[in-house]
């Protein structure tokens, strides 16, 4: 403890670990604790978090629980999917994209209640500590940050449990031993890491999966759906207009039923180590295929290729926690500009873990069937023009070839 803290806003789930952190903040810092619990669509009842906080001595006016599902999808998930953001070729950034919103809300609450510190439950080995704290500092540069996992001396699960028992923190029976793996979930995905998943040579046990059925157990008949887009954002499924959160929840249902969205990944953490995670992103997996499908006919080649070049950097910025950085905002502005004509409808076939694009249509389509056809009636296109095009593009290659020939190489 390096600084006197009067009031601290804790990102609080109501689970055992953050309940221990809550009591630790009270006993170690002597601070007044304010709890913030976010509903990001993790699928859990949040009222128990309120009751747990009250039980641990938090004043009712210091308990904040907010339904952020619509804001999460509208202002974070959808902008990210306009970029087709994928980290290291596979990861759809489900955990990463949730952290800046939580950090933003914590800072807003800190300003509202006059808190001089914020706290989180991320460990000292992971990426989340970086993501939370970069967000805090970006939004309130003079904020004090308390990261208990980097400060306290609880070196084992047994010591944590002993602390909980000492301070009469309720402990579920299944929490007394080490959990077989840790879970993070929101409306975009569910992730599992640690323990039984730490050996990358071993297959993920079936009991780890919570958001998807086994693709082999999925229906033998495919499911066909249509998704409508307006300026890069999905707005309707099968002709039914939905809010962002409702739409993603519906895609999750469809993906779950068809075994879509499982990913076993060894990724490179920002802090320097490799980690193995199991991700389930059913709705997001469908959405990515659909968005790329509508872009195929509405984006100019140059814009599409530039977007694909920018995407890895954009994804890396989100993964590493730089959502509020100017370079992410610069890239977002370019990406959003590219989406002004990305409107139309795609048709998809969902089948045993696969998302298959089977149709796309748009009033802004750049696809000209009369131009590309080999049949009679094609629009004016002089095949002889290709000769000059090829010769000009071959000029430097011919020059290089002449040099090699001259030097006998």
Curated annotation (Swiss-Prot):
What InterPro entries does the database record attribute to this sequence? Answer: Arginosuc_syn_C (IPR048268), Arginosuc_syn_N (IPR048267), Arginosuc_synth (IPR001518), Arginosuc_synth_CS (IPR018223), Arginosuc_synth_type_1_subfam (IPR023434), AS_cat/multimer_dom_body (IPR024074), Rossmann-like_a/b/a_fold (IPR014729)
Q: What class of enzyme is it?
A: ligase
Q: Where are the transmembrane segments?
A: none
Name the major location. Answer: cytoplasm
Q: Which GO terms describe its biological process?
A: argininosuccinate metabolic process; L-arginine biosynthetic process; urea cycle
GO cellular component terms, A-Z = cytoplasm
Q: Which reaction does it catalyse?
A: L-citrulline + L-aspartate + ATP = 2-(N(omega)-L-arginino)succinate + AMP + diphosphate + H(+)
For the ligand (L-aspartate), the binding residues are 123, 127-128
Question: Which Pfam family, giving just one, matches this sequence?
Answer: Arginosuc_syn_C
Keywords (alphabetical) are: Amino-acid biosynthesis, Arginine biosynthesis, ATP-binding, Cytoplasm, Ligase, Nucleotide-binding
Locations listed in the record: Cytoplasm
Known pathway: Amino-acid biosynthesis; L-arginine biosynthesis; L-arginine from L-ornithine and carbamoyl phosphate: step 2/3
Q: Where does ATP bind?
A: 11-19, 38, 121
Q: Which residues bind L-citrulline?
A: 91, 96, 127, 131, 182, 191, 267, 279
> Which chain positions lie within coiled-coil regions?
none
What Enzyme Commission number(s) apply to this enzyme?
A: 6.3.4.5
What would be an example GO MF term here?
A: ATP binding
Q: How does it assemble?
A: Homotetramer.
* Family membership noted in the UniProt record: Belongs to the argininosuccinate synthase family. Type 1 subfamily.
User: What name does this protein carry?
Assistant: Argininosuccinate synthase
Species of provenance? Nitrobacter hamburgensis (strain DSM 10229 / NCIMB 13809 / X14)
């Amino acid at each position: 403890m390096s600084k006197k803290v009067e009031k601290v806003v804790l990102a609080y789930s109501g689970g055992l670990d953050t309940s221990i952190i809550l009591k630790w903040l009270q006993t170690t810092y002597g601070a007044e604790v304010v709890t913030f619990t976010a509903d990001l669509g993790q699928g859990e009842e949040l009222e128990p978090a309120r009751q747990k906080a009250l039980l641990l001595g938090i004043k009712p006016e210091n308990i904040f629980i907010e339904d952020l599902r619509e804001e999460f999808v509208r202002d974070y998930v959808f902008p990210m999917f306009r970029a087709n953001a994928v980290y290291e070729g596979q990861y759809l950034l489900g955990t990463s994209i949730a952290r800046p919103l939580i950090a933003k809300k914590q800072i807003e609450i800190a300003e509202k209640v006059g808190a001089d510190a914020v706290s989180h439950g991320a460990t000292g080995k992971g990426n989340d500590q970086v993501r939370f704290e970069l967000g805090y500092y970006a939004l309130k540069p003079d904020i004090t940050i308390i990261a208990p996992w980097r400060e306290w001396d609880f070196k084992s699960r047994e010591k944590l449990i002993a602390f909980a028992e000492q301070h009469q923190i309720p402990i579920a029976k299944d929490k007394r031993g080490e959990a077989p793996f840790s879970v993070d979930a929101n409306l975009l995905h569910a992730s599992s890491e640690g323990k039984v998943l730490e050996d990358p040579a071993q297959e993920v046990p079936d009991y780890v999966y919570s958001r998807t059925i086994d693709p082999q157990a999925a229906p033998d008949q495919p499911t066909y759906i249509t998704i409508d887009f307006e300026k890069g954002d999905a707005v309707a499924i099968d002709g039914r207009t939905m809010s962002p959160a409702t739409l993603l929840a519906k895609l999750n249902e469809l993906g779950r039923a068809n075994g879509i969205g499982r990913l076993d990944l060894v990724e490179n953490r920002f802090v320097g180590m490799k980690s193995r995670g199991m991700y389930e992103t059913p709705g997001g997996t469908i959405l990515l295929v659909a968005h790329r499908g509508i872009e195929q006919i509405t984006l100019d080649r140059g814009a599409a290729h530039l977007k694909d070049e920018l995407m890895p950097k954009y994804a890396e910025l989100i993964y590493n926690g730089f959502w509020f950085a100017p370079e992410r905002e610069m890239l977002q502005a370019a990406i959003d500009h590219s989406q002004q004509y990305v409107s139309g409808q795609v048709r998809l076939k969902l089948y045993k873990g696969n998302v298959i694009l089977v149709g796309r249509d748009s009033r802004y389509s750049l696809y000209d069937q009369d131009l590309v056809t080999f049949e009679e009636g094609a629009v004016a296109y002089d095949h002889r023009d290709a000769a000059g095009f090829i010769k000009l593009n071959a000029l430097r290659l011919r020059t290089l070839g002449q040099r090699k020939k001259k030097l006998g190489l």
